[in-house]
Amino acid sequence: SRRQRQMCIRDRYDKMMLRSRKQMSETNMLMILLTISGGLQDAYSYFVRGEVFSNAQTGNIVLMSTYVAKGNWHRALHYLIPVLAFAMGIFIAERLHARFKDVGFIHWRQIIVFTEMVLLCIVGFIPLGGSYDFVANALSSCACAMQVQSFRKVNSYPYASTMCIGNMRSAMESISAYMRIGDKSLLRKSLQYFLTIFVFACGAGIGGAYSLYIGNEFICCLLYTSPSPRDTR
């Protein structure tokens, strides 16, 4: 019947849109934008905001523990705050996912990207030094956590846009499997991870070089590397 044909067409359209959303959030172009942003943010927070990592929480925990052992509690707090903010960012991203995953007029990843852009914009207006850096680093780490929690695949491969250790492990694991099995898809998989690591290194290098010259306003440049919300569905 005509009604059944219309329902069939609608179902096909919905499936097509669902595939399109998935593809847009897993493309190499989006991966490049997010990963460059991840490298830039780490460089900015380290060189401009008191040698704190906005992404690499393992490094923050190592430094925090060192200062705790030395009895320098104020300096230890300097590294504890971004760790807690990162954890909170993951929680917020997951809550937004649960709340908006079934909403039709907007995709939950669009909300994540918009929130991240707002947080980074606020950081750009926070003065440098002292207690201001505590706030800036907390907001940056929260934004980074929301990003890494929300964008976890590129071309169907799990990856991290704000750190390298997992990507490096997956790359070398895929090469080892390729040498053992000979499946070329494993070689392509390893190249995907090496590309991600290279892009992160480029972002960190650019951030490390230019954040020292531009200063606090450099974080606002990240808004130009952030993907448009409409490209993250």
Report each predicted region and the residues it spans.
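Alpha-helical transmembrane segments of multi-pass membrane proteins
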Residues: 13-226
